[in-house]
């Protein structure tokens, strides 16, 4: 696009030509005017010759004009303010003195020092000037056509009558004159000569601007001098002087050049000065120099340095202006922005926003009419206004150059669009009110205060929304719609209620604790009862963390309760606190906070005793709790250690008891420290998403690691990390201790030996010292998070109820496995009563589990294969850890009690059967026996219980599959922890069990208040936090309650029925979820009668627990209850085998669309790594390949590898790398291969890594030799279903049935 020529182009003399294309003309030194003139044509017209005046650097495309100009040109051109009607010729002459003219001459004046800097700027500016011509000045340039490339000729005429709002000011002792400074020019950069160069020049301009900022520091000094000079110079004269100046500076072209820079054609010298001053003033502001906001027109002159064009406001005395440095280019940029801040033309300062270096059409808007600053005082005032915020702004924008954008806000007070512009971020608003609200985001002002909790908001609307939260609890209190000055928050009142508050700050304090439970950074001096929960709290006491507390009031009390629980000090007092803390108000009497007067007391002692009497009164409850709320910093470390374990329960507490006085005092002292976000870390100020995340985050500061591995002693900050870590021990140590006696915990590597050992117990040959019923749970809870009891297993039994409650299901399994070995190693027996009954129950449970496992295996051999853990594996494991698993497995609750009850319900009848099932290794021959067991199972007593004859048995059955899975896991077969539906691997069985609930839609933990179902106890506990503690029925906290999974040992027997119910309800779901699915499903396959029996048995059991009543949808087959018809419908498919959703690729069918979607991901290899659940692990194939004890390596290398030869090499090679890399096929994929005889399956189906299905047949044979029932049944299944559909689908069905 052709560049539009300036009306009065002025050659830019700069050692560094921003635009190489410009060639010599621009490079010419000030003295090279003649040469420049020769080369000029290149730079300006491109096609025309350009003559450059060596004195003023003015460019002329016509020789005649150039000669005429030389006659009148002087080294010190007067300032010329060009009005639109001004004669073109004069402007041309004066523009010549463009700031770029000769830096050397500038040296003549006092500005000499400044001249150096200005010289550079001047050079830059000319470049911009040239660029500007291209862009055309947005402002009043007569060359409005600039947007369209105008022919070179038109520009020339422009010289004659540049109506551009360019003001030329003579710079004393310099040739520098203001050059046109349009934004376009800036954009064009130094493309003075070549239009194409303009764009490239932008970066250069930006760099120069940065340099100019530094130069401006020097300019500021000059500006000060200029100010004084201007003040001395005729302020009134400016205009007159300007007019005279205009006459001498008749060259209108110069103004055209200047318009960009001077954007504000100063009708009066003072205005010009103001503009100029504003330019430098901005820099001053940035630099922290005093803003040149002085109303004096002279003040504006300081801008002169910024804009040569406006160098001397008093045109009459151009000399004073002369000091303005040539740096004008940048200063101009900055000055424009500044002027933008000034009401007039610069108002378009929006261009300033662009100014940062982007060519902003607005920049050129230095409107060409002096009208912009008709009154110098006005412009000065505008400049001053702009500068005031600038200094502050610069502080905020540390790294950002003082781009004009900063000044934009007031740029054009006259321009309605820019009237409401933010001076900090240049955003434009439609109204002043909107702007004022926006400014609060910069200032942090929050004038509207909630009169209930003390939270502050930037707008009344936000306050209204927030206030709705209090309507229910405080319907009688009206919102205070009026702003409350924040400083009043620090002013104590006789009532103890801060200004603008209708209630004492007690609740807010609680909230504060809530929000910052981990680090009660509140100074110990505050005397808040809440113990500095963070060990390092004492260190932080002075830190703003305390303020967060004050802010916390904004947060709901529940959070505060959490905080209380978090506070270490509360740990030992926790129970007491819960009572007292239920409602801080109740404790304190709410109003008592008015005692706040004592709040003024520093309570620096931070000890309850030291607290003021009023504080003590409120503190007393805390002390009663036994937690010195105001624990001194010395106590903090201990507290931190304690609180970690307490977090889960602390959440239930409504709030901590704190003295009203201390609370109020804390509020007062910490108001200034308030944090904007309730979930903000008081130490590093990081904002977390929620309280729980904040709690965990604080551990990074405190170094707290509340979750310790009982095996290796490693500690972790989160329970999840600990669970994941447990997998490390399961993978290998379990290999050494595959089987443990459920009674004496003795370890056996051979399942058969274990069975014999159990028989010895049964025969009385070995003393029965069974693990306490609650041992497993206790272990789980211990592993879960009780640090205090970590050392003593005995305490776990007691703590089990609470601790296990939270994540019973989750941690139990993980903790249980490692826990057993720990106990055995430790040699410490759980203190729970080792009643003979419990031991017998444990033994019977184990036997029953074995039987049920065998029967289940027989019933669903195929299923077992698919389930990812061979039944045989389970069997072997069953004997070893079936009981243990049952115990731990039992829905993370009185599993033992169930086992005992089940034992009573169905005494050892299953023992014989259980004995039949032998370790997988031995099982090869026995597998056939196992199959018979299927038929026998229904008849055998064990079968009946398994079918559900006894709820306890049902639970056992469920547990058995889990235990089997667990055992397989212990063996080191990770596949048991891989979801058979979606292939996601999990670190432990408990995690897998919980995960299966996402497929089965089972939500065994039901809130007694709202009947909402939760998949885990932890989720239920979190949900309970949504209910106020008062609302929760006392029985909720009874271990035997719906939360029963955490029942204590003593109550195990007494609560056997409810427990069993739980187990059955939860356990069945769990068993099914595991995909062992046979336990109950097996019963289903068996005569329906037994199931129905189970159902009836469950019915009475289910009735008692209040949580069961809400579930109205009961499964007729297994008695499970569901909260919705859809969940029941999905569940019923596990009994009917219906799988309406089929995979179009491999033919596998699924019970839910969600499962199908997940499965589809298995066909997309590229996506596998993307999702955690899609990870392929070499171990996964083991589970799928068979339940028997065969190692995957054996199966794969011998069977599959041998078969690989039968497959097309390309088929095998495709996936060889994946397998070797550890990307084992997914369970589903492996099962597909195992299904055997489906060589045609696409590689993508997941048959991938394994040899073709055809090769699997022989592999299957070997598997059979390994006596894996799953494999045996697999053959049958394959023969039966191969013709109709891919074998994978058949297996999937089985698996689905088991899982769902």
From Swiss-Prot:
Q: Which GO CC terms are listed, alphabetically?
A: nucleus
Q: Where in the cell is it found?
A: Nucleus
Assigned keywords, A-Z:
DNA-binding, Metal-binding, Nucleus, Phosphoprotein, Repeat, Transcription, Transcription regulation, Zinc, Zinc-finger
Tissue spec: Widely expressed in adult with highest levels in heart. Expressed in fetal brain (in neurons of hippocampus, cortex, mediodorsal and ventrolateral thalamic nuclei, putamen, cerebellum and brainstem).
Q: Which residues carry this modification: Phosphoserine?
A: 109, 919, 1177
Q: From which residue to which do the C2H2-type zinc fingers run? A: 51-73, 420-442, 448-470, 679-701, 707-729, 739-761, 977-999, 1005-1027, 1113-1135, 1141-1163
Query: Where do Basic residues bias regions lie?
Result: 1-11
Q: Give the Pro residues compositional bias ranges.
A: 87-100, 145-157
GO molecular function annotations of the record: DNA binding; DNA-binding transcription factor activity, RNA polymerase II-specific; zinc ion binding
Q: What is the documented function of this protein?
A: Probable transcription factor.
UniProt-recorded name of the protein: Sal-like protein 3
Stored SUPFAM superfamilies: beta-beta-alpha zinc fingers
User: What segments bear the compositional bias annotation Basic and acidic residues?
Assistant: 122-132
Q: Spell out the InterPro entries in the cross-references.
A: Sal_C2H2-zinc-finger, Znf_C2H2_sf, Znf_C2H2_type
Keyword Transcription regulation annotated: yes
Compositionally biased residues, Polar residues: 577-586
Q: By which gene is this protein encoded? A: SALL3
Its BP terms in the Gene Ontology are: regulation of transcription by RNA polymerase II
């Amino acid at each position: 696009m052709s560049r539009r020529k300036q009306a009065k182009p002025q050659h830019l003399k700069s050692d560094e030509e921003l635009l190489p294309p410009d060639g010599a003309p621009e490079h010419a030194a000030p003295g090279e005017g003649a040469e420049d003139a020769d080369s000029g044509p290149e730079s300006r017209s491109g096609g025309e010759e350009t003559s450059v005046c060596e004195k003023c650097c003015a460019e002329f495309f016509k020789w005649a004009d150039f000669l005429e100009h030389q006659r009148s040109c002087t080294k010190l051109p007067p300032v010329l303010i060009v009005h639109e009607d001004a004669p073109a010729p004069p402007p041309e002459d004066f523009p010549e003195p463009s700031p770029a003219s000769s830096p050397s001459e500038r040296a003549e004046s006092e500005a000499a020092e400044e001249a150096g800097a200005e010289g550079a700027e001047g050079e830059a500016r000319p470049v911009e000037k040239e660029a500007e011509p291209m862009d055309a000045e947005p402002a009043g340039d007569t060359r409005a056509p600039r947007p369209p490339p105008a022919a070179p000729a038109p520009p020339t005429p422009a010289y004659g009558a540049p109506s551009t709002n360019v003001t030329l000011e003579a710079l004393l002792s310099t040739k520098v004159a203001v050059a046109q400074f349009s934004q376009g020019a800036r954009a064009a950069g130094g493309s003075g000569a070549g239009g194409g160069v303009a764009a490239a020049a932008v970066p250069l301009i930006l760099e120069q601007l940065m340099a100019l900022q530094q130069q401006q520091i020097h300019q500021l000094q000059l500006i000060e001098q200029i100010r004084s000079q201007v003040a001395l110079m005729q302020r009134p004269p400016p205009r007159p002087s300007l007019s005279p100046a205009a006459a001498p500076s008749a060259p209108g072209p110069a103004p055209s050049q200047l318009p960009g820079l001077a954007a504000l054609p100063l009708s009066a010298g003072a205005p010009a000065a103001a503009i100029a001053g504003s330019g430098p003033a901005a820099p001053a502001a940035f630099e922290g120099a005093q803003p040149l906001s002085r109303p004096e027109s002279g003040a504006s002159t300081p801008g002169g340095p910024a804009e040569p064009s406006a160098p001397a406001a008093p045109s009459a005395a151009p000399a004073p202006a002369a000091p303005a440095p040539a740096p004008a280019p940048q200063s101009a940029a900055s000055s424009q922005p500044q002027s933008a801040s000034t009401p007039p033309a610069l108002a378009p300062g929006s261009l300033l926003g662009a100014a940062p270096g982007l060519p902003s059409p607005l920049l050129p808007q230095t409107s060409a009419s002096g009208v912009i600053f008709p009154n110098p005082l006005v412009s000065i005032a505008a400049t001053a206004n702009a500068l005031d915020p600038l200094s502050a702004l610069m502080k905020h924008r540390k790294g950002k150059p003082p781009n004009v954008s900063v000044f934009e806000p007031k740029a054009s007070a006259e321009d309605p669009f820019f009237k409401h512009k933010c001076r900090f971020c240049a955003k434009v608003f439609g109204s002043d009110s909107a702007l004022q609200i926006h400014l609060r985001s910069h200032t942090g002002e929050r004038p509207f205060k909630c009169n209930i909790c003390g939270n502050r908001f930037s707008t009344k609307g936000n306050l209204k929304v927030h206030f709705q939260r209090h309507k229910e609890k405080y319907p009688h209190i009206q919102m205070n719609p009026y702003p409350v000055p924040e400083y009043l928050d620090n002013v104590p009142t006789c009532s103890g209620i801060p200004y603008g508050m209708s209630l004492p700050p007690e609740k807010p304090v609680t909230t504060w604790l809530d929000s910052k439970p981990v680090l009660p950074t509140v100074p110990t001096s505050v005397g808040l009862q809440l113990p500095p929960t963070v060990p390092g709290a004492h260190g932080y006491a002075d830190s703003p963390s305390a303020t967060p507390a004050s802010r916390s009031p904004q947060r709901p009390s529940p959070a505060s309760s959490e905080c209380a629980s978090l506070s270490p000090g509360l740990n030992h007092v926790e129970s007491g606190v819960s009572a007292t803390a239920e409602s801080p108000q109740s404790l304190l009497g709410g109003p008592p906070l008015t005692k706040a007067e004592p709040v003024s007391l520093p309570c620096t002692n931070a000890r309850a005793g030291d607290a003021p009497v009023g504080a003590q009164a409120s503190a007393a409850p805390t002390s009663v709790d036994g937690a010195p709320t105001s624990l001194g910093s010395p106590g903090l470390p201990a507290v931190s250690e304690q609180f970690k374990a307490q977090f889960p329960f602390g959440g239930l507490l409504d709030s901590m008891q704190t003295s009203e006085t201390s609370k109020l005092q804390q509020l007062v002292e910490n108001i200034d420290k308030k944090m904007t976000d309730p979930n903000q870390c008081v130490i590093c100020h990081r904002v977390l998403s929620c309280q729980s995340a904040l709690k965990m985050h604080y551990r990074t500061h405190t170094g707290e690691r509340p979750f310790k591995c009982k095996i290796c002693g490693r500690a972790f900050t989160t329970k999840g990390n600990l669970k994941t870590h447990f997998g490390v021990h399961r993978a290998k140590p379990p290999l050494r201790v595959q089987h443990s006696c459920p009674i004496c915990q003795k370890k056996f590597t051979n399942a058969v030996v274990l069975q014999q050992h159990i028989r010895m117990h049964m025969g009385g040959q070995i003393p029965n010292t069974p693990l306490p019923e609650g041992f497993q749970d206790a272990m789980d809870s211990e592993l879960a998070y009780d640090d205090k009891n970590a050392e003593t297993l005995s305490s776990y039994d007691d703590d089990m109820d609470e601790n296990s409650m939270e994540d019973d299901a989750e941690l139990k399994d993980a903790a249980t496995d490692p826990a057993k070995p720990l106990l055995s190693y430790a040699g410490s027996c759980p203190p729970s009563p080792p009643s003979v009954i419990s031991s017998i129950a444990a033994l019977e449970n184990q036997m029953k589990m074995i039987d049920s496992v065998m029967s289940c295996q027989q019933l669903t051999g195929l299923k077992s294969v698919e389930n990812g853990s061979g039944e045989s594996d389970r069997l072997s494991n069953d004997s070893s850890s079936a009981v243990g698993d049952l115990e731990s497995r039992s829905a993370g609750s009185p599993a033992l009690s169930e086992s005992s009850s089940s034992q009573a319900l169905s005494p050892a009848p299953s023992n014989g059967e259980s004995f039949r099932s032998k370790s997988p290794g031995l099982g090869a021959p026995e597998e056939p026996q196992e199959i018979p067991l299927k038929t026998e199972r229904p008849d055998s007593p064990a079968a009946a219980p398994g079918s559900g004859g006894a709820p306890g048995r049902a639970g056992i059955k469920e547990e058995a599959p889990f235990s089997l899975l667990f055992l397989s896991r212990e063996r080191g077969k990770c596949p048991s922890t891989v979801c058979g539906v979606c292939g996601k691997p999990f670190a432990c069985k408990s995690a897998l069990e919980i995960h299966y609930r996402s497929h089965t839609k089972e939500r065994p933990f039901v809130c007694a208040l709202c009947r909402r179902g939760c998949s885990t106890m932890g989720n239920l506990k979190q949900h309970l936090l949504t209910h106020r503690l008062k609302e929760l029925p006392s029985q909720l906290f009874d271990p035997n309650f719906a939360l029963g999974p955490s029942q204590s040992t003593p109550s195990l027997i007494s609560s056997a029925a409810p427990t069993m119910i739980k187990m059955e309800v939860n356990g069945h779901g769990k068993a099914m979820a595991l995909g062992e699915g046979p336990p109950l499903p097996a019963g289903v396959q068996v005569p329906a009668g037994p199931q129905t029996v189970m159902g009836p048995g469950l019915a009475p059991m289910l009735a008692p627990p209040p949580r069961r009543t809400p579930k109205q949808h009961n499964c007729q087959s297994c008695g499970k209850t569901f909260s919705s018809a859809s969940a029941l419908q999905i569940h019923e498919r596990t009994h009917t085998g219906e799988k309406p959703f089929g995979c179009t690729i491999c033919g596998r069918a699924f019970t839910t669309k969600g499962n199908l979607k997940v499965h589809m991901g298995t066909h997309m290899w590229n996506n596998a790594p993307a999702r955690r659940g899609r990870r392929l692990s070499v171990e996964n194939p083991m589970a799928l390949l068979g339940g028997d004890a065969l190692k995957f390596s054996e199966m794969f290398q011998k069977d599959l590898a041998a078969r690989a030869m039968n497959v097309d090499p390309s088929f095998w090679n495709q996936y060889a790398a994946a397998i070797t890399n550890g990307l084992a096929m997914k369970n589903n994929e492996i099962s597909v291969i195992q299904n055997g005889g489906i060589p045609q399956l696409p590689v993508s189906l997941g048959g991938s890594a394994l040899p073709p299905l055809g090769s699997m047949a022989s592999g299957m044979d070997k598997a059979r030799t390994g006596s894996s029932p799953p494999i045996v049944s697999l053959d049958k299944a394959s023969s039966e279903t191969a013709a109709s559909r891919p074998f994978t689908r058949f297996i999937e069905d089985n698996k689905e049935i088991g899982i769902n």
